[in-house]
């Protein structure tokens, strides 16, 4: 399946050259009559984002990979090619912190609370996205997110109070009760995948932890080893990215936070929480279901279950002759069928 995939989509697999390209061709047996419009697609694999921008500006490709561009790169591309059509949209991918709650020192709930109180979410957003990210909980934030907690309500949760200095002062008081202080810091390793979307926020996280007597040492992990390391829970603190398949509480909550779930990488397990997730899943009234989901988000935050740093927005650019492409706002995994795309040239 990795080298000769078979499917029923608008395009059929032709060729895969590792680290070079992927080619697909129009599927004449596609179930939707008259689609796709394109005869095929050649995907060029470009590892370096800056090189990818130059490739686009030079006209060697028709569009960037969907959601390929972070905000600074998007601005760079537009400055070099003002005619490019670009959209920056929510990706339903959040940056989050995982703490190994099954091993010292973060088997202590008070220490997990300290880490939560250390966070300055606005600093992450302003530094890494030029202010274009979104503060939220586990669910995609509004307005694009249907189920996310309103910002004013978020501010009442632990660590979300905009008064970061107050939050950190409270965290230092907890640390002092635990025997730490200015002359005795807690040393931990902060593990993350060794690519910029992971590594850059991990560096900022280390700065934030330092404000509450926790000295973090960055441990960059090769991509091939990252997921196995996470699955083994071979970390103390980890900076991770979580992408959701759609904006729906069942998908997000069951997959990432219930006991034993495949995506529950930090091992959070609370049977009462699982019952809360079941209750919202059975509620037909959307308004009532939202209230149940918001109670769940509060519970996750109070339990410091994978604290969310921010929800990212990612960019896609295409040349004006590319028609029919619509970026999705509920997940980076949707809107990739390309069946409605055509070239006006």
Language model feature labels by segment:
Residues 1-36, 40, 169, 173, ...:
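Gly/Pro-rich hinge or "lid" segments in bacterial periplasmic/extracellular proteins
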Residues 9-12, 22-23, 39-45, 63, ...:
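Short, well-ordered beta-strand elements
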Residues 11, 135-177, 195-200:
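Structural transition elements
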Residues 14-25, 42-103, 114, 122, ...:
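Extracellular/periplasmic solute-recognition and catalytic clefts
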Residues 73-87, 232-235, 248-263, 319-325:
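Ligand-binding "clamshell"
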Residues 86, 102, 106-148, 168, ...:
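Periplasmic-binding protein-like
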Residues 109-113, 125, 162-165, 215-226, ...:
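Extracytoplasmic/peripheral linker and loop segments enriched in polar/acidic and small residues
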Residues 316-345:
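Long beta-strand-rich cores associated with HINT superfamily self-processing modules
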